[in-house]
Amino acid sequence: MKKKIVVYIAASLDGYIARENGEIDWLESVEGEGDNGYEAFYQTCDAVVMGKATYDHVLKLTSNFPYHDKKCYVFSRSAQGKDQYVEFINESLASFLNNLNQDTKKIWLVGGADILADFLKAKRVDEFIISVIPVLLGGGIPLFKQGIPEMNLKLTDIKQYGQIAQLYYEK
């Protein structure tokens, strides 16, 4: 069975996932409902993948690593081996996915924009769950970088959590 790769992420209404400096403080400015469906989604995932900058940012945000109960992989050009939380990946995306344990069926691609662009260029994203935050940032780190391939998607669901619209798309 093919591994399903899901992007589950929040973005501003104008398409940014963070300010230019990487800050995501604006996420707290909007009222949602509970955890906005996060825990239900998280429990369906077998593994978590992110880029090194996202990993560093997660470590800065909290003293308790939030993904400690899942296999967690961090793509990095510099870090190697493992630390207490993650395994660093220096190999190609295709090689990484081929070498993953057969039991790994659903992978959450946390971000950021660079690793997302790599997965999109390799045509390896199967589903998007985007929580649209009703904030206009006017600039920052875009969810989708220029140069990604065109991709037609199908809207499969829309959920509302307070002021947050969560959009579900599949390829």
Task: Show where each model-derived region lies.
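Enzymes that bind and transform nitrogen-containing heteroaromatic metabolites
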Residues: 1-171
